[in-house]
Amino acid sequence: MTTAVEATAQVVEAFGKPHVNVGTIGHVDHGKTTLTAAITKHYGNFVAYDQIDKAPEERKRGITIATAHVEYQTEKRHYAHVDCPGHADYVKNMIVGAAQMDAAILVVSGVDGPMPQTREHILLAKQVGVGYIVVYINKADVSDPDMIGLVEMEVRELLSKYGFPGDEVPVVIGSALKALEDDDGEYGKKSIDKLMERLDDYVEVPPRSVDLPFLLPIEDVFSISGRGTVVTGRIEKGEIKIGDEIEIIGLKATQKTTCTGVEMFKKLLEKGSAGLNVGILLRGTKREEVERGQVLAKPGTITPHRKFKAEVYILKKEEGGRHTPFFANYQPQFYLRTTDVTGSIKLLEGKEMVMPGDNVSIEVELQVPIAMDKGLRFAIREGGRTVGSGVVSEILEWV
């Protein structure tokens, strides 16, 4: 299956433009889906409101999420855009990363101003590493102009509170419904043009995975007589070629080695790059010194850790999750990249227990260290079934 990052390279080739993943966030009924429909009408292949609202369900890491995917383009860029019909779907999508966002369009009603889900989505966007937010104040055609000014101030304060540059964030004022109805006024189609301009100018194109430091999660290890130890896996990012120094990280003490060969389907390659399933031959490394769950990485680019903070979503009973709540010191398995590791959960102040269907911040202490950095996604499993999903929001101890 093609990942979003691999797809980026293909999209640039297909459209001849840089690619950015965006999504709409914000409180229920503030107009996220109407705005999505309006953007497609003027910048893509039109997708009607009810088609977006009846988004098909996808399964990702054992969790079912309803997400609508649309695409559109400006003169400068190609955008893939995700919109979720329900609040629970937003929360799950942002944590599970079914559709990763480089930037979010925060939709706020000019009539109501920021509401509880507005806050929750901003906080989640920060926790899961969404880099940029552009604001669209909607329903301006039926709002008091003074009220719109207050809403903008409030939104900027809220963004600053949660770690975004509230003073710099672009704010566009308009009416998604007017734009959908082809209104030529300031709040109609012109507001969509302005929003697209702000996205183009404010949001930076993320680096492609192939330009990042090399990382390969180890899936299997073989010993080939006369040649040495081969590890296999899919290159998550970067490139590797013969002669490159690499580190083996996680589960035990970090080891240094050198790549003496890159193979794919029994063919020798000059180099392996992001997205490819390869075998890497390691110099002087014994079969028993390497195992599934470790990673190969460019030296000094990733370190092993046991303690971290995470933002998690716990599945409901109907989603195949737990039937009962859990309490502090609950010890499930954490499936990180290619392996399960047992860990203990600490609940943050004021939280006595976690119910199925909850979205919470937790602290985790794993029994063994795993190569990780902020933004790593994982599944929470119990007896082989997925009971939750999460994303690392902060590393708590440095080995």
UniProtKB/Swiss-Prot annotation:
<comment type="subunit">
    <text>Monomer.</text>
</comment>
<dbReference type="InterPro" id="IPR004161">
    <property type="entry name" value="EFTu-like_2"/>
</dbReference>
<dbReference type="InterPro" id="IPR041709">
    <property type="entry name" value="EF-Tu_GTP-bd"/>
</dbReference>
<feature type="binding site">
    <location>
        <position position="33"/>
    </location>
    <ligand>
        <name>Mg(2+)</name>
    </ligand>
</feature>
<keyword id="KW-0251">Elongation factor</keyword>
<dbReference type="InterPro" id="IPR009000">
    <property type="entry name" value="Transl_B-barrel_sf"/>
</dbReference>
<dbReference type="InterPro" id="IPR050055">
    <property type="entry name" value="EF-Tu_GTPase"/>
</dbReference>
<dbReference type="GO" id="GO:0097216">
    <property type="term" value="F:guanosine tetraphosphate binding"/>
</dbReference>
<feature type="region of interest" description="G5">
    <location>
        <begin position="175"/>
        <end position="177"/>
    </location>
</feature>
<dbReference type="Pfam" id="PF03143">
    <property type="entry name" value="GTP_EFTU_D3"/>
</dbReference>
<protein>
    <recommendedName>
        <fullName>Elongation factor Tu 1</fullName>
        <ecNumber>3.6.5.3</ecNumber>
    </recommendedName>
</protein>
<dbReference type="InterPro" id="IPR009001">
    <property type="entry name" value="Transl_elong_EF1A/Init_IF2_C"/>
</dbReference>
<feature type="region of interest" description="G4">
    <location>
        <begin position="138"/>
        <end position="141"/>
    </location>
</feature>
<keyword id="KW-0378">Hydrolase</keyword>
<dbReference type="InterPro" id="IPR005225">
    <property type="entry name" value="Small_GTP-bd"/>
</dbReference>
<dbReference type="InterPro" id="IPR033720">
    <property type="entry name" value="EFTU_2"/>
</dbReference>
<dbReference type="GO" id="GO:0003746">
    <property type="term" value="F:translation elongation factor activity"/>
</dbReference>
<keyword id="KW-0342">GTP-binding</keyword>
<dbReference type="InterPro" id="IPR004160">
    <property type="entry name" value="Transl_elong_EFTu/EF1A_C"/>
</dbReference>
<feature type="domain" description="tr-type G">
    <location>
        <begin position="17"/>
        <end position="208"/>
    </location>
</feature>
<feature type="region of interest" description="G1">
    <location>
        <begin position="26"/>
        <end position="33"/>
    </location>
</feature>
<keyword id="KW-0547">Nucleotide-binding</keyword>
<comment type="function">
    <text>GTP hydrolase that promotes the GTP-dependent binding of aminoacyl-tRNA to the A-site of ribosomes during protein biosynthesis.</text>
</comment>
<feature type="binding site">
    <location>
        <begin position="26"/>
        <end position="33"/>
    </location>
    <ligand>
        <name>GTP</name>
    </ligand>
</feature>
<dbReference type="InterPro" id="IPR004541">
    <property type="entry name" value="Transl_elong_EFTu/EF1A_bac/org"/>
</dbReference>
<dbReference type="Pfam" id="PF00009">
    <property type="entry name" value="GTP_EFTU"/>
</dbReference>
<dbReference type="GO" id="GO:0005737">
    <property type="term" value="C:cytoplasm"/>
</dbReference>
<feature type="binding site">
    <location>
        <begin position="138"/>
        <end position="141"/>
    </location>
    <ligand>
        <name>GTP</name>
    </ligand>
</feature>
<dbReference type="InterPro" id="IPR000795">
    <property type="entry name" value="T_Tr_GTP-bd_dom"/>
</dbReference>
<dbReference type="GO" id="GO:0005525">
    <property type="term" value="F:GTP binding"/>
</dbReference>
<comment type="similarity">
    <text>Belongs to the TRAFAC class translation factor GTPase superfamily. Classic translation factor GTPase family. EF-Tu/EF-1A subfamily.</text>
</comment>
<keyword id="KW-0648">Protein biosynthesis</keyword>
<keyword id="KW-0963">Cytoplasm</keyword>
<dbReference type="InterPro" id="IPR031157">
    <property type="entry name" value="G_TR_CS"/>
</dbReference>
<dbReference type="InterPro" id="IPR027417">
    <property type="entry name" value="P-loop_NTPase"/>
</dbReference>
<dbReference type="GO" id="GO:0003924">
    <property type="term" value="F:GTPase activity"/>
</dbReference>
<feature type="region of interest" description="G2">
    <location>
        <begin position="62"/>
        <end position="66"/>
    </location>
</feature>
<feature type="region of interest" description="G3">
    <location>
        <begin position="83"/>
        <end position="86"/>
    </location>
</feature>
<keyword id="KW-0479">Metal-binding</keyword>
<feature type="binding site">
    <location>
        <begin position="83"/>
        <end position="87"/>
    </location>
    <ligand>
        <name>GTP</name>
    </ligand>
</feature>
<dbReference type="Pfam" id="PF03144">
    <property type="entry name" value="GTP_EFTU_D2"/>
</dbReference>
<keyword id="KW-0460">Magnesium</keyword>
